[in-house]
Amino acid sequence: MHVKGLAKLAVLAALVIGGGIYAAVPVATFAESKTLALQIALDRRGFSCNTIDGQWGRRSQVALATYCAVNGYAVPPSPELARDILFPRERNLFRTETVTQREHDALVRIPATPEGKASLKAMGYETIMEMYAERGHLTEGALRRLNPGVAWPNPPVGTVVKIPDFINGQDAKSPKVSVMRVTLSRFEITAFDEMGRLVALFPCSIAADKAKLPPEGELQVTTLIPNPDYTYTPERVSRGGRIVRRIFPPGPNNPVGTSWMGLTLPGYGIHGTPKPERIGCAESHGCFRLANWNAVRLRKMCETGTSVVIEK
């Protein structure tokens, strides 16, 4: 099916489920939630709701509807049925990890000033909670619910923590992308392979200032950089003052996160973020911002020259 046809099909499928939120079904523990299991299964296949939280909202609805549209399935009427019908044999949803001294030693405090940020060796995680939430593609609230007895935000060395298992998930099998479509009105990026098949969906943030939005049209990927640094340039300088640029070191709390894809439009790119739970709105400075794990995954699916279509 043509790329645009598939994109429209995904939108139509999303409309089928409407804007309602399904009522939560009581479960013995949060880890047994079928909504949580469904979000994990969809994420593994490249259809992301952004941060996994076990709640059935718009982003989860769109991820499910798009996955169903691509695969020719009817959209089940509830997340519980979707889990049972689409992924009845999904295994190894979770893994456990043990908090180490090395992880504690790697924590940093991110200063408020550009000078302070530039002085760091790395813009790492500020808490163990932030570290493990990102590792499991979770909201911090969901991480707490999965591990209710843990002393958050910085549990001691030796604490065992349960998170969704993405190390051995299907994300390692992601296909190569030929075209990406950035749909500004829906705050999302869809990725298509060389046959025009929709293979991934990622929520994104766009510029809050409409004047900074790139024009509609086609761009290309020019650079792919893991763990980028960031050049900070002040927006305002006092009259007669000198512009002092600062280089912020790499790390998950770097303003562009852990991945950068530069585009043929100078100054614009697709990148990560230090605040994944805020993805999906108008708040960036002009670029397209994804959760770090989605930015990394998308970068690995692309190459220089990959087409990027900007559309309303």
Go through the PLM ranges and name each one.
Residues 2-10:
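Bacterial N-terminal signal peptides that target proteins for export
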Residues 167, 173-273:
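Gly/Pro-biased beta-strand-loop elements
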Residues 58-104, 144-175, 179:
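Extracellular LysM carbohydrate-binding repeats and other cell-envelope/extracellular binding modules
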Residues 29-61, 99-137:
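Primarily a LysM-type cell-wall glycan-binding module
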Residues 248-259, 264-312:
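C-terminal soluble interaction/assembly domains
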Residues 43-47, 65-73, 87, 134-138, ...:
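Sec-exported extracytoplasmic/periplasmic mature domains
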Residues 36, 40, 58-66, 127-134, ...:
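Solvent-exposed, polar/charged alpha-helical surfaces in well-ordered, non-transmembrane soluble domains
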Residues 121-201:
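Secretory/export targeting leaders with adjacent low-complexity proregions
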